[in-house]
Amino acid sequence: MNDYYSQGLKKRTPINSSSHYDIVNNIKNLLEKGEGTYRENCKSIDGVEENQEELFWNLCNLIGTPLSQSTQGEKILSIKNAGLSADDPKVRGPNTNQKLSFHSDRCDVIAFLCLQPARSGGENQIVQSEEVEQVIRKERIDLHSILSQKFPYKTHTIDGANPLPYCEQPIFSNRDGFFACSYLRVLIDRADQDPHCPDLNDSQKEALDFLDSVCERKELQSCFTLQKGDMLFLNNWTTLHRRTAFDDHEDSEKKRHLLRIWLSMPNSRPIDESFRRNFGAVEAGAIRGGITPSIQ
């Protein structure tokens, strides 16, 4: 959380070698022009196991621009099971031990560092969103058309500096030949349940259910479990991700613990104009996304 950011991590472990910059450029290209995923252990980059948090922070700063992930302006978020129930209005999915649904986050790239894996479970599952889109286009072109239209998203309870009750944006979109997928069903469902937000019709609900069912197809999924020191980077416009439920150790020092950073990328793609309200900018390479801090 903020304690990591306040410790001056960006100053204490400089990354200066040409090999590190080669790694940075390779990661950027893989994320935007490749499969949209990059996974590596800190030790294979730095050769040592110490200062992994600092290496992670420095690497992220070279790859892109870290964004605020809360109204407190946290740029490094500590991901642990907070013991909150699923119906708690302040709960954020990553801070539970329950299975998550496939989704994307409000940034170009999401980055994780695993400090401690769970005792069991917590498997990461990733699908290529363009592959999912192609399946839907082939099997249910009628639903594909619906998913390319705007859906209401309820403003998250943790997004306190946002005065808007909801925004509307498509799940599948294309701008200037660049595909993009953005999806977080929990906020769509919350909008549907809110009398002050637009209701979903039956066709929209069917389209969302079919999208979820396609993501469940094992042949489309890449599955693995992050181990201590593993970093994972995902392009949120070209992948959807989730993790399975997990059981923690009793020892608090051994409980599952990840760090998360949201990145705006200098080589990002242009996105549909409808994302401007939620992301702040839609042009290629623009700094966009994140959550506006309450105090600037």
Where are these regions (language model features)?
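Short secondary-structure capping/junction motifs at helix and strand boundaries
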Residues: T37-E40, G64-K75, G121-G122
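Mid-sequence acidic-hydrophobic segments that form the walls
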Residues: N58-Q69, D108, L115-A118
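N-terminal auxiliary "cap/dimerization" subdomain that precedes the catalytic jelly-roll/cupin core
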Residues: M1-T65
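Active-site environment of non-heme Fe oxygenases that use a 2-His-1-carboxylate facial triad
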Residues: M1-N25, K33, G73-K228, F233, ...
